[in-house]
Amino acid sequence: VKRIWQFALLCLLLSALLVSPSFACQSLNRQGVLNLWDTGPLTLDPAISADMSSHIYITQIFSGLVRLDDELNIVPDIAESLPEESPDGKTFTFHLRQGVKFQNGREVKAADFKYSWERACDPATGSTTAATYLGDIVGAEDMLAGRTQGISGVEVLDDYTLRVTIDAPKAYFLDKLAYPTAFVVDRANVESGQYWWRQPDGTGPFKLKEWTPEQRLVLERSQIYYGEPAKLEQIVYLLSGESMGRYEKGETDVTLVSTSYIDEASDEASPLHLQLAITPELSLYYIGFNTAKPPFDDVNIRRAFCLAVDKQHIVKVILRDMVSEADGILPPGMPGYNESVAGLTYDLEKAKELIAASKYKDASNLPPITLTSGGSGNSIPAYLGAIIQDWQQNLGVNVTVRQLEMEDFLYNLNEEKDEMFMLGWIADYPDPHNFLDILFHTGSENNVFEYSSPSLDALLDQAAIEQNRAVRLALYQQAEQMVVDDAPCLPLFHGANYILVKPYVKNYELNTLGIPDLSKVYIENG
């Protein structure tokens, strides 16, 4: 399943909200407490989580051997240092910090990581991310397939030493271990019951204090965290109402900015301007085509649908330049980003020629088409409405939109996939592999397009193990152009985060993956 889900789609849906543009000055904040709005996590199980909203909580409660710092460099976490690497680049030896404890007081040992990773790869766990983030480890694929009971490439040398062997030298392997699937969990906690994750026993800077779904979730500072203690006493998530409205009333301290507020927030004369923070995001928002289902099993139809959408109008007029138009797959700031990629830009004549060249010959011969998106309510985002209108006016094709609650959307995407779907992807680590290989390689868990290209697979496989950085990035640029030309998706735009932060909230920052490090945040009450 995909990484972005709730957070990405939530950001997009917020862009369509219209609310009153008057902000209260008062705050209900008290010292040491950060108040936030959210819809809440789908799960707090690191092995199961595949959505951004859940990740934000999990990264506060759990931790792994390594993590990404603010500049997205890989740094030690529970490991006391970066691992010793063998000359062939395939074996990594980790030395764990001593004294790291789960919330129940038990010390974390190397065997806990072996258990956690093998649990994630156990077919009975049902992880949709283990193959992607742990699959490079020797023996992981065998366990995922049910052929073995353990991962042969993970060896416990002693209580504080773990040796990991991967199938080939890969520059991005350590980055993958910063993903929640590789976080450590307490076996006794997991075996306490099916919904153990509602009372998680983690190793992160915060612990779960209370959780009433659709009402309130509270994180509390861990008193036994091995790193620098969190500055906040509590983080209170309000799981109902509407983000901008709660911010306006002083009930929350941070909010996403909708398009209806961007002019006011960007105006230097506005009091909101000093509360505005903008951070780029390594992301891609797109419409995916089910290439195994008519009519999108025909590349001419896929390309025609791409060419018939006026993305420039959507970005500039509807989304108010809060995002940047996407011609390719890789976002600006990602290694290998190619600003000269030849995208399928707005061209109605070419679109009509492609439909005529397709096996359908004419748009009137296309089967019914449904586009599925995640969300709630009766209205769809304005930008999606504009895309639907472009297809109707420019191609004469009527597309039905089906909007589903997130859990239903995920089920639909994996079990009953419609012809098209609205999605996004936020990077997990700063490497083109995280977009091109994970999304488009044949058989990838996250290849929701049912797309397969042997020539692309060969290029991606070559890039994955190439040790010369310049050559490697050039291979990924070739792969990106192949994907754009074959059009398993319609790239729409690359995102950015526009947030309002109350003046008394300090150090609240989102990295380019869209995740805040809440352990650094503090409240400055006068």
Where is each model-derived feature located?
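Ligand/substrate-recognition segments at binding pockets and active sites
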Residues: 36, 358-427, 469, 497
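N-terminal lobe/hinge region of extracytoplasmic solute-binding protein
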Residues: 37-87, 118, 201-202
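Aromatic- and charge-enriched surface segment that lines or borders ligand/interaction sites
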Residues: 81-132, 163, 246, 295
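Extracytoplasmic/peripheral linker and loop segments enriched in polar/acidic and small residues
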Residues: 83, 315, 397-414, 437-503, ...
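Gly/Pro-rich hinge or "lid" segments in bacterial periplasmic/extracellular proteins
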Residues: 138, 145-152, 159-160, 165-230, ...
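Extracellular/periplasmic solute-recognition and catalytic clefts
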Residues: 209-220, 236-293, 316
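Append "and occasionally in soluble cytosolic enzymes with long acidic Gly/Pro-rich linkers
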Residues: 297-389, 393, 478, 525
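Long beta-strand-rich cores associated with HINT superfamily self-processing modules
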Residues: 499-526
